[in-house]
């Protein structure tokens, strides 16, 4: 019989608690800890007050390619790569720290909205890139690094910030900050006033 380490079990419980707090799905918890499914479900119920959601994990790379999700996924992945290269952390710890950085930059709305990129999707994104299904690619216009399908031809990718889809303009709300307003819109208003 293999003896379980009490220290390792305590670390797994602490990690599971942090992942549950950030919104991880049960499959992610099972993959990243050595705790039994039953213990994870009990821990989830204790922390969240409800059982974990049922269903399969996202398995399609297409979700990461739509304009808004791509921007958020790319922001997370760039933070992930930076932390990974720094060498101060590894494994799921890098995913958690990068996700916390992402949440600092893209906080959920005040209405209790969920963030656009959930922790489990961020974790799945890392797995997709590691398996070669997705890759980071440089935008030929702005030079930013964005997530694309694997084997994207070199110098052919234009990000959705440089070339936003028409529906993106409809969703955008103008900021009250003068530096954030679009000068073309202001010029258009000035011409209409004359």
Curated annotation (Swiss-Prot):
The record's principal subcellular location, in a coarse class, is cytoplasm
Required cofactor names: Zn(2+)
Report the SUPFAM superfamilies cross-referenced here. FlhC-like
InterPro entries recorded: FlhC
Residue positions annotated to bind Zn(2+) are 139, 142, 159, 162
Question: In its UniProt record, which GO terms are filed under biological process?
Answer: bacterial-type flagellum organization; positive regulation of DNA-templated transcription; regulation of bacterial-type flagellum assembly
GO cellular component terms, A-Z: cytoplasm
Q: Which UniProt keywords apply?
A: Activator, Bacterial flagellum biogenesis, Cytoplasm, DNA-binding, Metal-binding, Transcription, Transcription regulation, Zinc
In which compartments does the protein localize?
Cytoplasm
Recall the GO molecular function terms of this protein's record: DNA binding; zinc ion binding
Q: Cofactor note, please?
A: Binds 1 zinc ion per subunit.
Q: Does the keyword Lyase apply?
A: no
Q: How does it assemble?
A: Heterohexamer composed of two FlhC and four FlhD subunits. Each FlhC binds a FlhD dimer, forming a heterotrimer, and a hexamer assembles by dimerization of two heterotrimers.
NCBIfam families per the UniProt record, alphabetical? PRK12722.1 (NF009365)
What's this protein's family per the entry? Belongs to the FlhC family.
Biological function: Functions in complex with FlhD as a master transcriptional regulator that regulates transcription of several flagellar and non-flagellar operons by binding to their promoter region. Activates expression of class 2 flagellar genes, including fliA, which is a flagellum-specific sigma factor that turns on the class 3 genes. Also regulates genes whose products function in a variety of physiological pathways.
User: This protein is called what?
Assistant: Flagellar transcriptional regulator FlhC
